[in-house]
């Protein structure tokens, strides 16, 4: 049994694959299996990976390429990878990102030394090769995950494979990591954290204001809501949640945030209002919800969110340029 299985979804990532593959095959941890799950990518992504693999002959026997029978989306790809994984621990790496070459040795070493079910790390957000921010990836509780105070990304979370057996599969491809991570966290006995950034999330900005962008936003929104409603139902049916817990209320409101950049557009404002409307009566009285979040909530209802956001953004940029 390998120490670690790394699941790498592959779809239209040809320009980024060489960088990702090189950092994976260059890992200082020797005992790894690499599962490249090809979601019927129409480009040369897999060819690029195989070319890089020639530089690492010792890794050839550790690489598996599985091609999905049809383009199936991120959720199905991740679940296929989990089904194929043989490692003691499992982690995901998105093929347009990259990892520190010591990442998996550090995570696995801590997991073994402390008998952890889940071990997390911090990550760096990059754009055009420039670091934008460092994000803490630690996760201490499901409640804090649902409140949006801790991360649920699979790329910074190494999970004991036995926790992933029998999980309910996500039903859509946006927010699929939250469905998997929350279930794993509920089953975990012990968790730990490596307090340094080992993963590099490479942000590529997409417009959501033009026609194509709106279509993409609509699709992402519907997909997120499918998984959000599925997760809430799962928590209530299988894990004894009532639906009135502060973290569930805050999670419902958190789901609406995807619409905040376009909430000034009437159709999206209406969609925002109609999504989990029951939280509107509760969010202002929720102690776990920050004053800032309540402030923006009120401004959205007053239809002032967009102009105030633009003004505060201008002042922030102006102050940064003066410093």
Name each model-derived stretch.
Residues 90:
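Short aromatic/hydrophobic "clamp" motif used to bind/position activated sugar donors
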Residues 21-67:
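Acidic donor-binding segment of Leloir-type glycosyltransferases
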Residues 141-223:
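Conserved nucleotide-sugar donor-binding catalytic segment
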Residues 1-25:
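N-proximal low-complexity "stem/linker" segments adjacent to membrane-targeting elements
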Residues 60-61, 103-171:
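Flexible acidic/His/Gly-enriched loops in nucleotide-sugar-dependent glycosyltransferase catalytic domains
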Residues 263-323:
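Membrane-interface aromatic/basic loop that binds lipid-linked glycans or pyrophosphate carriers
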Residues 65-85:
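Glycine-rich, basic loop-to-helix element that forms the pyrophosphate-binding segment
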């Amino acid at each position: 049994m390998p120490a670690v299985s790394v699941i790498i979804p592959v779809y239209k990532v040809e320009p980024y694959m060489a960088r990702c593959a090189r950092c994976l095959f260059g890992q200082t941890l020797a005992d790894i299996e690499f599962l490249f799950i090809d979601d019927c990518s129409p480009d040369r992504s897999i060819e690029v990976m195989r070319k890089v693999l020639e530089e690492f002959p010792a890794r050839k026997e550790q690489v598996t390429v599985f091609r999905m029978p049809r383009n199936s989306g991120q959720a199905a790809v991740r679940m296929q990878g989990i089904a194929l994984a043989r490692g003691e621990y499992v982690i995901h790496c998105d093929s347009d990102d990259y990892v520190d070459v010591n990442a998996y040795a550090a995570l696995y070493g801590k997991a073994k030394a402390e008998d952890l079910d889940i071990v997390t790390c911090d990550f760096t957000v990059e754009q055009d090769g420039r670091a934008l921010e460092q994000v803490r990836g630690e996760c201490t509780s499901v409640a804090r995950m649902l409140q949006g105070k801790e991360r649920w990304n699979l790329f910074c979370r190494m999970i004991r494979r036995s926790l992933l057996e029998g999980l309910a599969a996500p039903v859509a491809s946006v927010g699929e990591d939250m469905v998997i991570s929350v279930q794993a966290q509920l089953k975990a006995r012990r968790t730990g954290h490596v307090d340094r950034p080992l993963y590099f999330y490479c942000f590529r900005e997409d417009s959501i204001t033009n026609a194509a962008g709106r279509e993409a936003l609509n699709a992402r929104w519907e997909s997120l809501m499918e998984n959000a409603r599925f997760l809430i139902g799962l928590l209530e049916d299988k894990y004894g949640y009532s639906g009135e817990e502060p973290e569930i209320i805050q999670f419902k409101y958190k789901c609406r945030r995807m619409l905040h950049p376009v909430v000034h557009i009437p159709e999206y404002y209406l969609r925002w209002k109609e999504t989990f409307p029951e939280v509107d009566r509760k969010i202002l009285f929720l102690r776990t919800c920050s004053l800032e979040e309540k402030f923006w909530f009120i401004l959205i209802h007053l239809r002032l969110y967009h102009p105030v956001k633009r003004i505060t953004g201008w002042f922030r940029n102006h102050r940064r340029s003066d410093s």
